Amino acid sequence: MIGFQFRPFFKYGIILVLGAVGIALFVVQTAETKGPKLAGPMQVFQLAPSAKPRPTTTWKDGNGKAISLAKFKDKVVLVNFWATWCPPCIRELPSIDRLQASLGGDNFTVVAVSIDRGGKPVAMLLVKRLKIKHLTLYLDKESKTARDLGVRSMPTTFIFDRMGREVGKLEGGAEWDDKDAVALVKFFIDNPNYADKLPRKK
């Protein structure tokens, strides 16, 4: 008799749980459909109109080893092209270093690529002067990857999702540890299927 009395409550409990799960799934799907909120300095961030695959070109690390974006599979990657002769690059680089310090790990990394023709010696002078501690030095002296991505001005920053698809870019400098920039990066970390709804570009 006691068990019978509790059955309605059990049934309603199941309904409430299923309803909560449905609402949660709706919220997640809605966020992925609408896309990230572009506020503050990220208002000029350009969301990709189509899901473009990552470039296959390579650049070099500080030891001269060839690296491509495929190395960072399953991570959201922020790729920043910078140069020592570019004042906006110099201003924003410390904030990119702080972004890597706060979010870098299994889900996210920053790839900061110098296009200085002087290579490592020139780039390292600025890295040391700015006391950059959390970024790995990458070099693209011939600007091959920058050209493949259609870089038109410096600095330019791209974000790629976990599947290696370009989801957007920002042309010009920004404070990348600003709360709105961090929120943008976290959106792509938390919504790995966002680019699924975009047209595919070969």
What are these regions (language model features)?
Residues K73, F81-R98:
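Conserved redox-active cysteine motifs that mediate thiol-disulfide chemistry
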Residues I90-L130, K141-D148, L198:
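Structural microenvironment flanking redox-active thiols in thiol-disulfide oxidoreductases
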